[in-house]
Amino acid sequence: MRVTGDRISEMGRELSARSGEAVCDLTGKWLLPGFFDVHTHGRAGADFSDSPSGELVRILSSYAKCGVTSLLATTMTMEENYSREMMERIRGAMEAEGEGARIWGINMEGPFLGPDKKGCHDPAYLKKPDCAFFEELDACSGGNIRLVDLDPTLDGAMDFIRTYAGRKKISIAHTSADYETANLAVDAGADHVTHLFNAMNELRHREPGVVGMVNDRRVWAELICDGIHVHPSVVRMTFASNAEKLCIVSDSLSAAGMGDGVYSLGGLEVHVKGKRAALADGTLACSVSNVFEECRNVISFGISPEKAIAAACLNPARAMGLETEIGDIRKGLLADMLVVTPDMELKQVYIGGKAVQK
């Protein structure tokens, strides 16, 4: 394989090094596409909802060092004026000339969420889908909101989905919706489910709820695979049902990579101990994991490396309409790549063909 500039320019067994070219011999190792986290609130002490643009640029290097070369900056439910400022800060980070993971857009998780499944979102700022407010936020972001999370049972939700389907990705999220309502949302244009099994009704054989959409080939589903949010046996069951449409996500907060302590998420206090992050009342509050670690978990749960790796790079790229840029190793794509051992030990990360400093 040859990299020219920041893209893969040639592939083939017949290639040989030209004079002056640097050569990387990866004998005995695997070369993987860089991983893509479509749902992450932050890590390394900074949060996409709270931190200034400079801090957001800083943590992109932290993502890259753990194998995440692409991400969607994921927001929380905040006060309206603060939400506008939040979008502007993320826009600033996207426009900065920094090193590290690429921000491909914003995953707007809130405020259009159900109060009965609010999780760690502040109920004081939840609201019904509002096209005018959304347009304001999208303008503040520079048009960079790529994924919008919402509860399809809220007044105006179906109209919102029909209005923005095709322009934005719409995800069913934080909802008590039954299967029939979820199916209507997909018919209207939603094609994504936020952290499957979490912040939704549990699966029942007569009332499958949103979980029942997992084998609908129209729908991409996020899955937090830290071993805490979803039991390993359920991860195996879900991969057996529809591995080609699953996206491993971290749903990480600023505490990821930082250790035990008390942190803030969307203005709420989060307590971290070991691998568990929770509000004071015990409600799970995001994770302290990363997609590379979770991909390793999935393999240890008994899923084939091929399916686990695809769920960390190719599937999310397809889900976000970015498969012509990232998610695979083929001619013309960005040279965002990981060098790993066969037992998934991360040895080197490349972004745009340039080695990331460890």
What does each model-identified segment do?
Residues M1-L32:
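Histidine-rich, glycine-flanked metal-binding segment
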Residues G28, H39, Y63, M108, ...:
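Conserved, mostly hydrophobic/aromatic
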Residues W30, V38, F48-R102, Y125-C140, ...:
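Alpha-helical scaffold segments that flank or form the walls of functional sites
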Residues F35, G42-S51, L72-Y82, A199-N215:
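Active-site loop-to-helix "anion-binding N-cap" substructures in soluble metabolic enzymes
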Residues H41, V57-M86, A101-G114, S141-T153, ...:
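Divalent metal-dependent hydrolysis catalytic cores, especially in the metallo-beta-lactamase
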Residues S62-L72, G114-G142, L184-L196, E207-W220, ...:
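Active-site gating loops and adjacent loop-to-helix segments of metal-dependent hydrolytic enzymes
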Residues D138-M258:
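Active-site core of metal-dependent hydrolases
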Residues G212-A221, F239-S250, A255-V340:
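His/Asp/Glu-enriched, well-ordered alpha-helical/loop segment
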